[in-house]
Swiss-Prot record:
Biased composition regions of type Basic residues, renumbered to the chain: 13-27
Key word Coiled coil present: yes
Coiled coil regions, renumbered to chain: 163-828
Listed name of the protein: Golgin subfamily A member 6-like protein 24
Biased composition (Basic and acidic residues): 37-58, 92-107, 664-684, 692-832
Comp. bias (Polar residues): 59-69, 77-89
Keywords (A to Z) from UniProt: Coiled coil
Assigned protein family: Belongs to the GOLGA6 family.
Region (Disordered): 1-107, 303-333, 351-431, 508-652, 664-832
Annotated InterPro entries: GOLGA6L
């Protein structure tokens, strides 16, 4: 609330002691008589007021002005005729009673209308309280749901942390498996080298065996030849025994025995050599069998490791499936959270709207109270000013009694000029008040704009925090992807090593084939043996090929895993792109919502301004009524002046009018009664704007007490006449204060001009904001075109966006129409 302009109050104006103070209504200052006035002055003042009511009111009797002028002419022409002075300005009591009765009826009607408005406001208040209660209950429920969702979110975050730990454990297991695979590949390389060496040694041994077998065959052939020779020699010996003499036989027998010994020794030596070669062959075969057993054991180990790897892969797949399921649950929970947050936001918006309505009602009530206080203070100040002016005029009349008859026309002209000046001043005051109210409304609008900007900033901070969280998650995903890429690079290096080993094996096979071709060119009898050896080699090669096929299968599985990972990565990238697009769309939708909220707030502001304009028009009507009342008061003042002139004439002719004083005293009593009625009406008018029907009874009691006080004041009026001179001196001081107030008014006018300049600057800013909104709309159109090119599924959302843009355009047209209406209303206000 902006501070209201302070109205100067009289330093000797205490509050009325008999008026009760309501806790929600400001105290009404009572206007008692000045304590420094004497009884004589008070009595003279009462007499003058009583004489004021003797004249006819201009609205009830239009012939009052003519009668007053006729009495003046008669006084000028015949100063000795006292009847003309009293009979012309008399007012019938029946007319006064009718006027008072009509005035009371009008006041009662106004009271009834105010009572109805109060009842309507109380009904609205109860409805708003009920709506507030239900909204608070709903907010509490939503707070409970929000707490549950927050707890679920915390649980989900914990679960996500556990999943990350499980992922890290799986990654470590995968690293261990990779290391174990590397070790196995190294062992496999070593075994392949040993196989290669063993194959080479086998070939060498086979060659040696072939040579030894050839030698054995030669030895056996020689043995058979020797045996044949021995048999022939034995036959020869037998023949020789028969033919030759014994000496020759002995010599030949000795010679043959020696040859047999030598041949038998050679045979034994060859047999021993053959046994050695057989033993060596057996040892080599045993080594080969042992190596084959070792190879089989290693193959079994490799198969077990492959089974373990498969089990780990299955576990990985299961964990990945669990991760996907958990991620889907997380997404569903997040969607539920978004929906509930949207509901909470809607309820918060409703609560804010209700709070705004309450604040507006409270502000209206406070403004009405302040305005009523200001009106009362202004009325009191006006009453005091009028009294001061009356006193000044009385002083001037006393000084200018001798010159009044000559300066009547000039005085009337000056009074008219003063009245016009007063009216102009009052109009300027009303305009300044209207400007001040407009400024207050502008300041309120600024405050609302600041509040909206703060809300927008808070929302942007939330969005930025969410984006930072998303960026952190993306960085984590990228780190995981980098780890996967590193693992894939290691696997590729291993594959390259395998390819190199396979190339070496192929080179060895080519060498074997060349050697086979060389062996095929050899003898035919060796082919059978070689075929047997080749069968063995083919079996070994088949085993090697089976191992290679297993390695190929493992590599294919690894490639498939890599392809699956790549597909998963591509899916993740696509999902991230979709999420980013959805985030962009949500941001755009949030911007559109913010724009719609701004437009709604502007529409509400426009409605409030229209309501305020209606209130201002009502106030203008009330002000016109007040002006009419002031005009009536001025007419009464003119009549009072005429009556004062008559009183002065009567003072000159007091000795002649002593007989008619008694009649005037009777008339004065009637006028006193009428004055009491008028004062009651004035109090009712002042207290009707603030108090309700229940307080009217208290006011009536106070009015009765005031009537008693008025009677006491009639006795003290005479004392007030003595104090008039002292008050004349104070009037000069008050005139100086009036000059100071005029200077303050000029300063206020300068402030008003500055505020008008600020208002123009605000209008420029508003136009700039409208241009920005148009630029944003153009950007939205460009984004929509891009969205048409990117995805066909977003066509429905784009149609919705177009509908929202059409709504925005309609709202802009409505805003423009409202601006045109506001300008027209401002022009009307300026014309008024």
């Amino acid at each position: 609330m902006w501070p209201q302009p302070h109205l100067p109050t009289h330093p000797h104006l205490p509050t009325h002691p008999h008026l009760p103070t309501h806790p929600h209504l400001p105290t009404h200052p009572h206007l008692p008589t000045h304590p420094m006035m004497s009884k004589e002055t008070r009595q003279s003042k009462l007499a003058e007021a009583k004489e004021q009511l003797t004249d006819h009111h201009p609205q009830t009797n239009p012939s009052v002005g003519t009668a007053a002028s006729d009495t003046k002419k008669k006084k000028i022409n015949n100063g000795t005729n006292p009847e003309t002075t009293t009979s012309g300005g008399c007012h019938s009591p029946e007319d006064e009673q009718k006027a008072s009765h009509q005035h009371q009826e009008a006041l009662r009607r106004e009271l009834e209308a105010q009572v109805q408005t109060i009842r309507i406001l109380t009904c609205q208040k109860t409805e708003l309280q009920m709506a507030l209660y239900y909204s608070q209950h709903a907010v509490k429920q939503l707070e409970g749901e929000a707490r549950d969702l927050i707890s679920r979110l915390h649980d989900s975050w914990k679960f996500a942390g556990e999943l990350e730990q499980a992922l890290s454990a799986v990654a470590t297991q995968k690293k261990k498996a990779d290391r174990y695979i590397e070790e196995l590949t190294k062992e496999r390389d070593a075994l392949s080298l040993e196989l290669y060496r063993n194959t080479i040694t086998d070939e060498e041994l086979k060659e040696k065996n072939a040579k030894l077998q050839e030698k054995l065959q030669l030895v056996e052939s020689e043995k058979s030849e020797i045996q044949l020779n021995v048999k022939e020699l034995k036959r020869k010996l037998e023949r020789a025994k028969l033919l030759l003499p014994q000496q020759q036989l002995q010599a030949e027998a000795d010679h043959l025995g020696k040859e047999l010994q030598s041949v038998s020794a050679k045979l034994q030596a060859q047999v021993e050599e053959n046994e050695l070669w057989n033993r060596l062959n057996q040892q080599q075969e045993e080594k080969m069998w042992r190596q084959e057993e070792k190879i089989q054991e290693r193959e079994e180990k490799i198969q077990e490791q492959e089974e373990k790897i498969r089990e780990q892969e299955e576990k990985m797949r299961r964990q990945e499936e669990m991760m996907w399921e958990k991620e889907e649950k997380m997404r569903r929970q997040e969607e539920m959270m978004w929906e509930k947050e949207e509901k909470i936001r809607e309820l918060e918006e409703k609560m804010h709207e209700q709070e705004k309505i309450r604040e507006q009602e409270e502000k209206r009530q406070e403004e009405e109270k302040i305005r009523e206080q200001e009106k009362r203070q202004e009325q009191e100040a006006k009453m005091w000013r009028q009294e001061e002016k009356i006193r000044e005029q009385e002083e001037k009349i006393r000084e200018q009694e001798k010159k009044m008859w000559r300066q009547e026309e000039k005085i009337h002209e000056q009074e008219k000029i003063r009245e016009e000046e007063k009216r102009q001043e009052q109009e300027e005051m009303w305009r300044q008040e209207e400007k001040i109210r407009e400024q207050e409304e502008i300041w309120r609008q600024k405050e609302k704009m600041h509040e909206q900007e703060e809300k927008i900033r808070k929302q942007e901070e939330k969005v930025w925090r969410q984006e930072e969280k998303m960026h952190d998650q993306e960085e984590k995903i990228r780190e995981q992807e980098e780890k996967v890429w590193r693992q894939e690079e290691k696997i590729r290096e291993q594959e390259e090593k395998m390819w190199r080993q396979e190339e070496k094996i192929r080179e060895q096979e080519e060498m074997w084939r060349e050697e086979e071709k060389m062996h095929e060119q050899e003898k035919i009898w060796e082919e059978e043996k070689r075929q047997e050896q080749e069968d063995k080699m083919w079996r070994q090669e088949e085993k090697i090929r089976e191992q290679e096929e297993k390695v190929w299968r493992q590599e294919e599985k690894i490639r498939e895993q890599e392809e699956k990972r790549q597909e998963q990565e591509e899916k993740m990238w696509k999902q991230e792109e979709k999420i980013r697009e959805q985030e962009e769309k949500t941001r755009e939708q949030e911007k559109i919502r913010e724009q719609e909220e701004k437009i709604r707030e502007q529409e509400e502001m426009m409605q409030e301004q229209e309501e305020k304009m209606g209130e201002q028009e009502e106030k203008m009507q009330e002000q016109e009524k007040m002006r009419r009342q002031e005009e009536k008061i001025r007419e009464q003042e003119e009549k009072i002046r005429e009556q004062k002139e008559k009183i002065r004439e009567q003072e000159e002719k007091i000795w002649e009018q002593e007989e008619k004083i008694r009649e005037q005293e009777e008339m004065m009593q009637e006028q006193e009664e009428k004055m009491g009625e008028q004062e009651e009406k004035m109090w009712e008018q002042e207290e009707e704007m603030q108090e309700q029907e229940e307080k009217m009874r208290r006011q009536e009691e106070k009015i009765r007490e005031q009537e008693k006080k008025i009677r006491e004041q009639e006795e003290k009026i005479r004392e007030q006449e003595e104090m008039m001179q002292e008050q004349e001196e104070k009037m000069g001081e008050q005139e100086g204060k009036m000059c100071e107030q005029e200077a303050k008014m000029q300063e206020q006018e300068e402030k008003m001009r500055r505020q008008e300049e600020k208002i123009r600057e605000q209008e420029k800013k508003i136009r700039e904001q409208e241009e920005k909104i148009r630029e944003q709309e153009e950007m939205m159109q460009e984004q929509e075109e891009k969205m048409w090119e990117q995805e066909e599924k977003m066509c429905e959302q784009e149609e919705k966006m177009q509908e929202q843009e059409e709504k925005m355009r309609r709202q802009e047209e409505k805003m423009r129409e409202q601006e045109v209406r506001l300008r027209q209303q401002e022009e009307k206000m300026q014309e008024h």
